[in-house]
């Protein structure tokens, strides 16, 4: 199967592609090239960086921020800023406080304290990323959304978020049944819920649970959501990726391919290069063994940084346009 043929699309529904792996393996370059290729195929594509240490702007050589920026006719990009996301919630809270009664104000003051804690708590990055996922999931504004993810640990926390939130909402619903209006302030701790005193807390919690269930269904639908694991031919990257795929399986998220990046050519007149090549050949055999049920694609080690759309399109040629080995080596040398 050609690597490009593994993509699946449902008419009128957004496809989600997560690109992940160990830090430093080239996730952003692969994500950017994938998004460019999809956009060039006529798909309205959004690429989202969920990594707190963003490098998407550097990869595309375009200034990108917290709000979507148009890169070309079909490509849009955003770098999630959790601080800005929290600031937006604080502004919305202040607006509500200006119209609140004394009783409501007490609850909103409590919410403000919780938001302050949440902004500094572990998981704030993942909460902001999950909110973006919910937003694009429900809007179907884009044909495809590519997530350029943070290193493995962050990404697993992001993808476990629906399970965590489902448990949290369930407990809040029980608390609501037991305590009644005492949970009116607590309901707003959930990052993607609006505090609206005119709507019953139980109804809002039930709606939130429904939204989370929909998110879980989308994430576990292999026709809509897939994970592409980027590795390099080194043991630490391979074993971490193997563990990550096992964790993704627990959340019913399909890993449909392995992209092996930074594969060296055999340069026989360079002892160091030849030694590295021989070591990589052993690691490539290990990859074939570990991931025998996956589609595996190889990307060569370029002599220059792969950044900017021109060089990313060279990566597109190799990854998605089926260049043979001679053409690959020629492109590597000429970059």
Can you describe what each PLM-predicted range is?
Residues 1-17, 22-25, 30, 34-206:
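Nucleotide-state-sensitive switch-loop elements of NTP-binding domains
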Residues 1-11, 213-335:
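C-terminal lobe/tail of nucleotide-utilizing enzymes
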Residues 29-32, 123, 127-130, 166, ...:
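Amphipathic alpha-helical transducer elements in NTP-driven molecular machines
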Residues 104-105, 191, 212-213, 219-220:
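Short, flexible segments with low predicted structural confidence
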């Amino acid at each position: 199967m050609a690597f490009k043929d593994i993509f699946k699309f449902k008419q009128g529904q957004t496809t989600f592609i997560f690109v992940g792996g160990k830090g430093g393996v080239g996730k952003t370059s692969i994500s950017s090239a994938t998004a460019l290729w999809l956009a060039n195929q006529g798909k309205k594509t959004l690429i989202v960086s969920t990594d707190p240490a963003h490098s998407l702007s550097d990869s595309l050589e375009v200034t990108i921020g917290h709000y979507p920026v148009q890169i070309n006719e079909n490509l849009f990009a955003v770098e999630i800023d959790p601080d800005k996301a929290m600031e937006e919630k604080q502004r919305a809270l202040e607006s509500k406080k200006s119209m609140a009664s004394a009783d409501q104000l007490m609850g909103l003051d409590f919410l403000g304290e919780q938001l302050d804690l949440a902004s500094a708590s572990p998981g704030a990055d993942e909460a902001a990323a999950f909110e973006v996922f919910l937003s694009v999931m429900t809007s179907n504004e884009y044909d495809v959304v590519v997530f350029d993810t943070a290193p493995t640990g962050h990404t697993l926390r992001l993808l476990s978020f629906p399970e965590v939130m489902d448990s949290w909402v369930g407990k809040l619903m029980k608390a609501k049944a037991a305590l009644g209006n005492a949970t009116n302030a607590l309901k707003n701790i959930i990052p993607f819920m609006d505090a609206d005193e005119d709507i019953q807390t139980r109804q809002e919690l039930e709606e939130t649970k429904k939204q989370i269930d929909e998110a879980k269904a989308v994430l576990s639908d292999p026709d809509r959501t897939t994970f592409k694991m980027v590795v390099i031919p080194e043991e630490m990257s391979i074993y971490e990726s193997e563990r990550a795929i096992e964790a993704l399986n627990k959340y019913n998220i399909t890993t449909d391919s392995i992209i092996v990046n930074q594969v060296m050519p055999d340069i026989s007149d360079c002892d160091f290069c030849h030694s590295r090549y021989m070591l990589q050949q052993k690691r490539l055999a290990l990859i074939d063994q570990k991931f025998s049920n996956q589609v595996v694609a190889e990307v060569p080690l370029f002599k220059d940084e792969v950044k900017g759309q021109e060089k990313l399109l060279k990566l597109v040629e190799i990854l998605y346009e089926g260049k043979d080995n001679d053409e690959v080596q020629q492109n590597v040398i000429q970059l």
